[in-house]
Amino acid sequence: MNFGKKVWLIGNSSEKSKKILNKLSKILKAEHFVFDDINPEIVISVGGDGTLLRAMHMYEYQLDRVRFLGVHTGHLGFYTDFTDEDLFEVVEALYDENPAQAIHYPLIRVQVSFTDGYQIVRHVLNEATIRRASKTMVGDVRISDYLFERFRGDGLSISTPTGSTAYNKSIGGAVVHPRVKAMQIAEIASLNNVVYRTLGSPMIVAEKDTITVCPAPEDDYSLTFDQLTFEYKNIKSIEFSLDGTTISFANCAHTPFWERVSKSFIGEVE
């Protein structure tokens, strides 16, 4: 039942998204849902996976008490289970939604430490990347306490299992099921020749391990946290770990992972 369930809607700048968001808002208000952007129970994204990622980061520090639901205004996405033609089904699903049956996906904790002792901590749903603006990046890569390699190339991407189908896949990474509690590190255009060597392939790193990148001192590093990009200098280290933080999706019409992969990259199989 509804009982005044608190929701909030987030869309993108497209006219179609604005139109669908407005229509869904009217339906939800008529059904006595409470609109609360400060402490929502469910955040509904109207757009694509990028809109859902933006919504997640808007509520990054409330993930322990917020669930998400995606309405796609184009085609089925990895984080969006409904289309713009399913608005009444969305409302019905929200009525029946049970928090105890939410679907949980792991997030990667990213801790950036600077040479002056300052630190920032973020969580990512898809991936985090590090690269330099226009020159070769050099950095030591540690797996837990072991110095694994000295990387040279354009950059590195560290992804979650759900994020393995995003940027990670485009740079040759493996697709990993979300039930596999692991991180994946993939190289971005690494240098491999008789002088410089890296592993040259993606790696699946176990849940108990950490990945630490210690980049060479430079002042033009670019870090991404999902779709958010920041420029930094004086970076001492970047540590990636699975600390148990998850994102929760309302279990309304959840599409199985391999079905999502097949529909997104293969299409109909005859």
UniProtKB/Swiss-Prot annotation:
Q: Which residues form the active site?
A: D49
**This protein's record includes keyword ATP-binding:** yes
Q: Name one GO molecular function term.
A: ATP binding
Q: Record's SUPFAM superfamilies? A: NAD kinase/diacylglycerol kinase-like
What cofactors does the UniProt entry give for this protein? Answer: a divalent metal cation
Matching Pfam families: NAD_kinase, NAD_kinase_C
Q: Which reaction does it catalyse?
A: NAD(+) + ATP = ADP + NADP(+) + H(+)
EC number(s) for this protein? Answer: 2.7.1.23
Record-annotated residues binding NAD(+)? Answer: 49-50, 54, 126-127, 152, 154, 165-170, 189, 227
Task: Provide this UniProt record's keywords sorted from A to Z.
Answer: ATP-binding, Cytoplasm, Kinase, NAD, NADP, Nucleotide-binding, Transferase
Q: What is its main location?
A: cytoplasm
Keyword check for NADP: yes
What Gene Ontology cellular-component terms does the record carry? cytoplasm
Q: List the subcellular locations.
A: Cytoplasm
What InterPro entries does the entry give?
ATP-NAD_kinase_N, ATP-NAD_kinase_PpnK-typ_C, NAD/diacylglycerol_kinase_sf, NADK
Q: HAMAP family, alphabetically?
A: NAD_kinase
Recorded family membership? Belongs to the NAD kinase family.
Function statement: Involved in the regulation of the intracellular balance of NAD and NADP, and is a key enzyme in the biosynthesis of NADP. Catalyzes specifically the phosphorylation on 2'-hydroxyl of the adenosine moiety of NAD to yield NADP.
Task: Report what the protein is called.
Answer: NAD kinase
- Organism of provenance: Lactococcus lactis subsp. cremoris (strain SK11)
